[in-house]
Amino acid sequence: MGDELLDKTYVHLVVDDNTANLLRETLLVLGRNEEVIAVSDALAMGPLTDVDEGARSRFEWWARLGVQDLQELENYVDDRAIWDALRTDPRDVMLWSSAHPDEHLFALRACWHLRDYPTRIHEVVMTNKLYPRVSDAFARLGIMGPKAGVAHWSDRSRIVDVKERANRWEAIRSREGDWLRELRDGQIVHLGVDAHDEKLVMACSKDWTDSIRAVGGVIAELPVGLSLLTWRIHTLVRDGVLEARGPTNRLGMPSELKAKGVTA
């Protein structure tokens, strides 16, 4: 960290409201009274081609996955007002990200939106340095909390490759279709929306299995969202790959699942 960063005042950007609240706690510990803004959409899945132009395809994507509050959904995906305000705000911007694909993509996108103001953009990249047993994909502030945020504050730096990151975002955004996106060796890899179906089926391949346990095993291993897995389970049941029984649980899934053909 260069000395020129010591006395700056920032507006802080994060992914999702939970992380925003934890960052506010972090800043209080650091003695900093600064604004925190959450940019909420989970960019690691779904279409991206119009995400910076109203995000109608993302609205349709989340509706397909079962989001029912359409007004809240529209506010969730269309964040143009946030970026418009940041471009006219004289303060420097601090991005908080990690190796989680949602946060990696968020940081690339922020560089694209603020590409005309490259000297204003800084970052804190969370790692597992405080908790080495946690994989970097899960070493995000929203999981590890304020203690880790405080420990990483001294690692903050100005982003020097804003143009390159903006170009990478444009390339990723231009790829049409519904995709899952993973971060491998620092690069975004595109996968089909059914990429984790086999893991879900394997989790139910021996007997009737609690559906929450089935999705929990995948979430514990991979940085993938619950809403996607819930949608995939309904698709697999509809297509006859999984059998279901019992009432709908609190996550909107059948209580129990079993792979087709398994004798319980």
What are these regions (language model features)?
Residues 31-33, 109-121:
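A short alpha->loop->secondary-structure connector
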Residues 213-226:
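Short helix-coil junctions and helix-kink-helix linkers
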Residues 247-264:
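Short, cationic-aromatic polyanion-contact patches
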Residues 237-248:
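A short, conserved structural fragment
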Residues 223-238:
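Short amphipathic alpha-helical interaction segments
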Residues 65-108:
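Long, hydrophobic/aromatic-enriched structural stretches that serve as scaffold segments
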Residues 137-209, 213:
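A conserved mid-domain beta-alpha-beta active-site/ligand-binding segment of alpha/beta enzyme cores
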